[in-house]
Amino acid sequence: HREEQARYIVKNKPVTMSCAASPATQIYFKCNGEWLHQKAHHIEEREDETTGRSVREVQTDVSRQQVEELFGLEDYWCQCVAWSAAGTSKSRKAYVRLAYLRKNFEQKPLGKYALLDHEVLLHCRPPDAIPQAEVEWLKSEEIIDPVIDQNFYITVDHNLIIKQTRLADSANYTCVAKNLVAKRRSSTATITVYVNGGW
């Protein structure tokens, strides 16, 4: 059995669910407990190059509208059911979710004055998103890579720590959130590093 994992509908593009079983005399999709109409299936039979056995593969498209019609009840899911002389086998449920990335950051970084050689913390809580947004930080529009510059540390909850400020860390910092749908930028925070007793 080759099985499906969670799939995401981006904007209005349907997702294609596919499933293959060998051996199988029949193979169909069941979505949210209901059998899909035969017309909604695209079934192909082919030979597995390694085993030489016959493989039956089924595909179906799931549209945004289908997922929205189930709104509020539960996640939309499909499962593949195959029959053969040996009996029936079912795949795990594969979920179809509507992908989105909200516009507003839950917490934005704020500019500040920072004393030379001191630690600075910049907060970032990305917008609500499915699938969860990945976060990166920009320093003057360049991506910060803590592996290369170990004076920077990005926490598990997406905050940026400058361990010991250097004069070169005076810059504009921006938090960027991205997923399948879009890329969003927080407002920019300006860090000004100063030397005690003077600028």
UniProtKB/Swiss-Prot annotation:
Source superkingdom: Eukaryota
SUPFAM superfamilies the record matches: Immunoglobulin (SSF48726)
Residue spans, topological domain Extracellular: 1-199
Annotated S-S bridges: C124-C175
Keyword Cytoplasm attached: no
One annotated Gene Ontology cellular component of this protein: plasma membrane
Subcellular location: Membrane
One matching Pfam family: I-set
One GO-annotated biological process of the protein: cell-cell adhesion
Membrane topology type: Single-pass type I membrane protein
UniProt keyword annotations, A-Z: Developmental protein, Disulfide bond, Glycoprotein, Immunoglobulin domain, Membrane, Phosphoprotein, Receptor
GO molecular function annotation: cell adhesion molecule binding
PTM info: Phosphorylated on cytoplasmic tyrosine residues.
Keyword Nucleus attributed: no
Glycan-linked positions: N172
Tissue-level expression: Expressed in the spinal cord, primarily in neurons of the lateral gray matter and in dorsal cells. Also expressed in reticulospinal neurons.
Ranges where the Ig-like C2-type domain occurs: 103-192
Function: Receptor for netrin required for axon guidance. Mediates axon repulsion of neuronal growth cones in the developing nervous system upon ligand binding.
Family under the similarity heading: Belongs to the unc-5 family.
Name of the protein in its database record: Netrin receptor unc-5 homolog
Originating gene: UNC-5
